[in-house]
């Protein structure tokens, strides 16, 4: 009897453990699948290719400007701001995944030099926290603290994103030196046109996969179209699927060519990348420079005083 109870208890514990594991997996997967920029993080070990191109451009095909502002120099173990600017016309609306029109979102990736990282909350000043707002930054990889990502966030509120950055200290990190370092940034506004698997989103142009005559255009119940094309080369019917939210440029009976646009281009966003330079300055060098400048100023003052004294002596000799 006791053995049976023991086995029953073990079975219940195993069942409970499996249930908890499944719940954790489902919750984790749901959060990952909706996270951004999960596409880049899942498919690329490093967001910046050897050519210098940031991989976000593989999905966001339109080229748009982006800018970054950082201090020229920073001291070790200090917190500074890296401000990423993603400008666009706030009146623009984009096609959402459900086919409706909505506001644009923005996102950014900041690639810092090795050793630089996101500043801990207790090192961020109240003024800087006010600029940051409710933004939540994350590392591109757990072992890549120098690469930060953010988004998607509402573009109307966060077209300027302030990253709080902690500068490294060469005294405690021997891999860091007092040098000039590059900083790279990529920023997008709006949805992408291509998914990582190569399929298109509904935020891009759809072209004809065959040349011929459009025999039928079927409007689907949940939105979108099925366009039937009679191929001019062999008479076979080819069906092109158009997702919801796109505006057709063709009509039934129209003769079209291969790769001719079937829809207008709905994309109003785009991706851009830029760079900046920052100098990790040695405090002793700054102190030495200040001492030198102070010495020069004092020398000039003494020269002026000496000159005035000499002029007084000359004047007194002339009067004598």
From Swiss-Prot:
Any GO BP: photosynthetic electron transport chain
Major site of localization recorded for this protein: plastid
Cofactor: heme
Entry superkingdom: Eukaryota
InterPro entries: Cyt-f_TM (IPR024058), Cyt_f (IPR002325), Cyt_f_lg_dom (IPR024094), Cyt_f_lg_dom_sf (IPR036826), Rudment_hybrid_motif (IPR011054)
Cited SUPFAM superfamilies: Cytochrome f subunit of the cytochrome b6f complex, transmembrane anchor, Cytochrome f, large domain, Rudiment single hybrid motif
Gene3D superfamilies for this protein: 2.40.50.100, Cytochrome f large domain, Single helix bin
Topology in the lipid bilayer: Single-pass membrane protein
Listed GO CC annotations: chloroplast; chloroplast thylakoid; chloroplast thylakoid membrane; cytochrome b6f complex; plastid; thylakoid
This protein's record includes keyword Membrane: yes
Binding of heme, residues: 36, 56, 59-60
Keyword terms, alphabetized: Chloroplast, Electron transport, Heme, Iron, Membrane, Metal-binding, Photosynthesis, Plastid, Signal, Thylakoid, Transmembrane, Transmembrane helix, Transport
Keyword ATP-binding: no
Record text on subunit structure and interactions: The 4 large subunits of the cytochrome b6-f complex are cytochrome b6, subunit IV (17 kDa polypeptide, petD), cytochrome f and the Rieske protein, while the 4 small subunits are PetG, PetL, PetM and PetN. The complex functions as a dimer.
Protein name as catalogued: Cytochrome f
């Amino acid at each position: 009897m006791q053995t049976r109870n023991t086995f029953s208890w073990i079975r219940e514990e195993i069942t409970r453990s499996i249930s908890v594991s499944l719940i954790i997996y489902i919750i984790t997967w749901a959060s990952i699948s909706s996270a951004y920029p999960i596409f880049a993080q899942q498919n690329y070990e490093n967001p910046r290719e050897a050519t210098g191109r940031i991989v976000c451009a593989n999905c966001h095909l339109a080229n748009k400007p982006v800018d970054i502002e950082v201090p020229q120099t920073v001291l070790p173990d200090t917190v500074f701001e890296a401000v990423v600017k993603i400008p666009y016309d706030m009146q623009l609306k984009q096609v959402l995944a459900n086919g409706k029109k909505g506001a644009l979102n923005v996102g950014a990736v900041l690639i810092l030099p090795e050793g630089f990282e996101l500043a801990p909350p207790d090192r961020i000043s109240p003024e800087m926290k006010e600029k940051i707002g409710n933004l939540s930054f994350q590392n591109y990889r757990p072992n890549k603290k120098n690469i930060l990502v953010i988004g998607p966030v509402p573009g109307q509120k966060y077209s300027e994103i302030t990253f709080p950055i902690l500068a490294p200290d060469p005294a405690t990190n021997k891999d860091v030196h007092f040098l000039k370092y590059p900083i790279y940034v990529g920023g997008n506004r709006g949805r992408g046109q291509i998914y990582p698997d190569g399929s298109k989103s509904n935020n891009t142009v759809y072209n004809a996969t065959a040349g011929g005559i459009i025999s039928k255009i079927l409007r689907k119940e949940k939105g979108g179209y099925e366009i039937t094309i009679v191929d001019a080369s062999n008479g076979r019917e080819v069906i092109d699927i158009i997702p919801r939210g796109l505006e057709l440029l063709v009509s039934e009976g129209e003769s079209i060519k291969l790769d001719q646009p079937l829809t207008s281009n709905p994309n109003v966003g785009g991706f851009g990348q830029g760079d900046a330079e920052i100098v990790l300055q040695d405090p002793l060098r700054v102190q030495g420079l200040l001492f030198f400048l102070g010495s020069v100023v004092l020398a000039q003052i003494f020269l002026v005083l000496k000159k005035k004294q000499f002029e007084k002596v000359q004047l007194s000799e002339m009067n004598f």
